[in-house]
């Protein structure tokens, strides 16, 4: 049985080095999809590069933890910027859900303005869309707009029922991440999904060239290792041998 494999590179628009890495991994590797931060400092550069890479499926990376929001969010920002304190607010059940709903709609419209089309799917920076308070908002929005949604099913148990018409991959893995990146690790992710019986799988990745912005990230040099692995000459053949075909959320 042929299985669908979506190799999605996060952080499109974060920096020029990140953008170039994603394009390289698409053009000369196995990356088929990406998610863009519409408030990223290099989003205009990402849009420009994407025009020469029409095969790259582009989704929207909903951002609530970095940079400036597009709408007024006094309940979530500090000094006008977003940050990781969202986790504390979630634990205190103090998230400003109406503000988050408005920001989601604004980022979505901004994506369409930038790229001239709807995103192929939705995802979020640091997976905040999987918070139990936020997930129903994002799932309902994706279903209403007819776009797919990345779902990490491990924390999903307390998030309620899914909308009937919501599209997603059957499996998702964030395991291709960390200090021990290798081709063997990537293939192990596929083998694990096969053993679970997943008919479709999204694998998250972050291929990049190193620039000053990426140097400031806690996850820096492994991004370059990811790029090496994802453009390996042997990897595409090994994927096909395992019964996977490369695709995107357009195929879900």
From Swiss-Prot:
Key words, A-Z: Carbohydrate metabolism, Chitin degradation, Cytoplasm, Hydrolase, Magnesium, Metal-binding, Polysaccharide degradation
Main location: cytoplasm
A single MF term (Gene Ontology): chitin disaccharide deacetylase activity
Catalytic activity of the protein: N,N'-diacetylchitobiose + H2O = N-acetyl-beta-D-glucosaminyl-(1->4)-D-glucosamine + acetate; diacetylchitobiose-6'-phosphate + H2O = N'-monoacetylchitobiose-6'-phosphate + acetate
Enzyme class: hydrolase
EC code: 3.5.1.105
Swiss-Prot/TrEMBL cofactor(s): Mg(2+)
Record GO biological process: chitin catabolic process; diacetylchitobiose catabolic process; polysaccharide catabolic process
CDD domains to which the protein is assigned, alphabetical: YdjC_EF3048_like (cd10803)
Residues binding Mg(2+): 125
Cellular component terms (Gene Ontology): cytoplasm
Localization: Cytoplasm
Pathway where it operates: Glycan degradation; chitin degradation
InterPro entries tied to this protein: COD_ChbG_bac, Glyco_hydro/deAcase_b/a-brl, YdjC-like
Function: Involved in the degradation of chitin. ChbG is essential for growth on the acetylated chitooligosaccharides chitobiose and chitotriose but is dispensable for growth on cellobiose and chitosan dimer, the deacetylated form of chitobiose. Deacetylation of chitobiose-6-P and chitotriose-6-P is necessary for both the activation of the chb promoter by the regulatory protein ChbR and the hydrolysis of phosphorylated beta-glucosides by the phospho-beta-glucosidase ChbF.
Family: Belongs to the YdjC deacetylase family. ChbG subfamily.
Oligomer and partners: Homodimer.
Protein's UniProt name: Chitooligosaccharide deacetylase
Record organism: Shigella sonnei (strain Ss046)
């Amino acid at each position: 049985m042929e299985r669908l494999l979506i190799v999605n590179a996060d952080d499109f628009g974060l920096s020029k080095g990140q953008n170039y890495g994603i394009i390289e991994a698409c053009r000369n590797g196995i990356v088929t999809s990406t998610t863009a931060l519409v408030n990223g400092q290099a989003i205009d550069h990402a849009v420009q590069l994407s025009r020469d890479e029409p095969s790259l499926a582009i989704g929207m990376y909903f951002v609530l933890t970095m940079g400036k929001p597009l709408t007024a969010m006094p309940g979530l920002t500090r000094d006008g910027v977003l940050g990781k304190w969202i986790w504390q607010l979630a634990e205190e059940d103090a998230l400003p859900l109406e503000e988050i709903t408005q920001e989601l709609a604004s980022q979505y419209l901004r994506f369409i303005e930038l790229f001239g089309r709807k995103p192929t799917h939705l995802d979020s920076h640091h997976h905040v869309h999987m918070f139990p308070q936020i997930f129903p908002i994002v799932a309902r929005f994706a279903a209403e707009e007819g776009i797919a949604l990345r779902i990490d099913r491990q924390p999903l148990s307390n998030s309620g029922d899914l909308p009937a018409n919501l599209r997603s991959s059957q499996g998702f893995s964030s395991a291709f991440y960390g200090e021990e990146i290798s081709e063997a690790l990537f293939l192990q992710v596929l083998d694990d999904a096969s053993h679970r019986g997943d008919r479709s799988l999204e694998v998250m990745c972050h291929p990049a060239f190193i620039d000053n912005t990426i140097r400031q990230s806690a996850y820096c040099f492994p991004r370059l290792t990811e790029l090496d692995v994802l453009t390996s000459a042997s990897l595409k053949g090994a994927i096909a041998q395992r019964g996977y075909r490369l695709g995107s959320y357009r195929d879900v």
